[in-house]
Amino acid sequence: MSITAERKQALIKEYATKEGDTGSPEVQVAVLSERIANLTEHFKGHKNDNHSRRGLLKLVSQRRRLLDYVKGIDQTRYQALIGRLGLRR
């Protein structure tokens, strides 16, 4: 199941660096993490859904690239972001 518009707006509001910020890497990583979590739950009941599994792998790769970008810009921002999201890296 995809994420609702209300949940996406809540994530944007929570992770935005300034008012109206929807494209910062922090916001993008937060939205991707929510989508990844939803797909992970989906796979608990649909183990053989290989088409969605490919989409999940693409999302994970995109999130990894964004996290690497943030890490290259500012190490403290990176550490704060993975701490807030509860990611292990």
From Swiss-Prot:
Instruction: Report the GO terms under cellular component.
Output: cytosolic small ribosomal subunit
Report the SMART domains cross-referenced here.
Answer: Ribosomal_S15 (SM01387)
Q: Which GO terms describe its biological process?
A: translation
Which Pfam family is an annotated match for this chain, by its short name?
A: Ribosomal_S15
> Does the keyword section mention Transmembrane?
no
* Keyword Ribonucleoprotein appears in the UniProt entry: yes
Provide the alphabetized UniProt keywords.
Ribonucleoprotein, Ribosomal protein, RNA-binding, rRNA-binding
* GO MF term list: rRNA binding; structural constituent of ribosome
Record function comment? One of the primary rRNA binding proteins, it binds directly to 16S rRNA where it helps nucleate assembly of the platform of the 30S subunit by binding and bridging several RNA helices of the 16S rRNA.
Subunit-structure text: Part of the 30S ribosomal subunit. Forms a bridge to the 50S subunit in the 70S ribosome, contacting the 23S rRNA.
Family note:
Belongs to the universal ribosomal protein uS15 family.
- Protein name, per record: Small ribosomal subunit protein uS15
Q: Which organism is it from?
A: Brucella anthropi (strain ATCC 49188 / DSM 6882 / CCUG 24695 / JCM 21032 / LMG 3331 / NBRC 15819 / NCTC 12168 / Alc 37) (Ochrobactrum anthropi)
Q: Which gene encodes it?
A: rpsO
